[in-house]
Amino acid sequence: MLWTDCLTRLRQELSDNVFAMWIRPLVAEEVEGILRLYAPNPYWTRYIQENHLELISILAEQLSEGRVRQVEILVDSRPGSILSSSEQPATTTAALQTAPIPQPAKGKREPEPVANTAVSSKSSKKKLLNPQFTFSLFVEGRSNQMAAETCRKVLTQLGASQHNPLFLYGPTGLGKTHLMQAVGNALLQAKPNARVMYMTSESFVQDFVSSLQKGKVEEFKKNCRSLDLLLVDDIHLLAGKEASLVEFFYTFNALLDESKQIILTSDRYPKELTELDPRLVSRFSWGLSVGVEPPDIETRIEILLKKAENSGVDLPRNCALFIAQQVVANVRELEGALNKVVAISRFKGAPIDLDVVRESLKDVLAIRARTISVENIQRVVSEYFRIPLKELVGPKRTRIYARPRQLAMGLARELTGDSFPEIGMAFGGRDHSTVMHACEKVVSLREEDPIFDEDYKNLLRLLQS
């Protein structure tokens, strides 16, 4: 049979995922020199037309020795010929290799009438908003202040072009999801009938593929495109899921065309998402991109104290300081460390003090002792500024050495558990008041001097990587 021969050749030409998901389920019949292929829905036919119909036409003409000179792809509406569930695609990671990126419509469309209710998912794959993720429970600091202020502004100007889409980026565990969902929770509190949907990239892919398998693509589109606010977490994880990316951008363009707000998060700045098509990345930059940095030590302390207060836990400030000095990577690890301290405290039936904290974090302390030390910080700072190590710790007070020295002392205070006197000894035997002054100077310089602040952040990333 001609179609069987075509399938054999297509299997060789296409990836396993594309063949299994899009080609194998097609039903074929030959009528008067025309090979008709039947797909389960319009989306499927459009995909085949845009990506594989030319190849199929060439193969059909060759393998039929000229008998077939035309190939058509149609929606299968023939009685009794609906594809069985066993013939539906099973993979969730098909590659839509060359599908063109949809352009936003030039004119406004009349929005479809929708129910006056907030969108919630019956699917276990799609997450509902976390009621704890509110602005009042979000601890602000220098590292996240701009992101928090921008999210509040979005609420007052929902869908405004200058911040639509809003793209929050930064390493994992820094509160991007909290801020994103805080917008959703605040909108629903102000407008209970608003249609808000939060989903991860994974849940978008799973729900989209499921809609394909069940022939419910139109329902999926309607659910996604009738929103007031769409929140999508970890958008970078759509890389390699090209079929889902194409559908996402139809949704993206439809929502922007109606001035509906979109908020996305990623672990990288949009232009660093090199694994995505540049045309897709450019769309992420249409609105506003805001970075979220790892919290500084003051913010980490406040996060711990607020978390403890909300949980009814008595956490002394000196214990919060100690935890904040040891756990520097992200908020998630910080909260995990606090949970461990609380668990050990309750198990021992003892109040939280430094002994309980040290016992709880002994694994963390052991790892940090092997990785970040004052000596390590000195080496990295001297290499970064290209100055001799002996001058960094030496007595010279010229600016070329004094600024890096102050910066190194500030990093040592933030990243190690060493006391002021211990840090002073490591810097040529300086006394504790000199180290205290250096740390205070670092705080003020970071606020006054953007270049100094950028150097501090760069070194922090180097030391934590």
Curated annotation (Swiss-Prot):
One of its GO terms (biological process) is regulation of DNA replication. Residues 346-465 are annotated as: Domain IV, binds dsDNA. The keyword Cytoplasm applies. The keyword Nucleotide-binding applies. Residues 128-345 are annotated as: Domain III, AAA+ region. Residues 81-123 are annotated as: Disordered. It is found in: Cytoplasm. Residues 88-127 are annotated as: Domain II. PROSITE patterns: DNAA. One of its GO terms (molecular function) is lipid binding. Residues 1-87 are annotated as: Domain I, interacts with DnaA modulators. Belongs to the DnaA family. Domain I is involved in oligomerization and binding regulators, domain II is flexibile and of varying length in different bacteria, domain III forms the AAA+ region, while domain IV binds dsDNA. This is Chromosomal replication initiator protein DnaA. It comes from Acinetobacter baumannii (strain SDF).
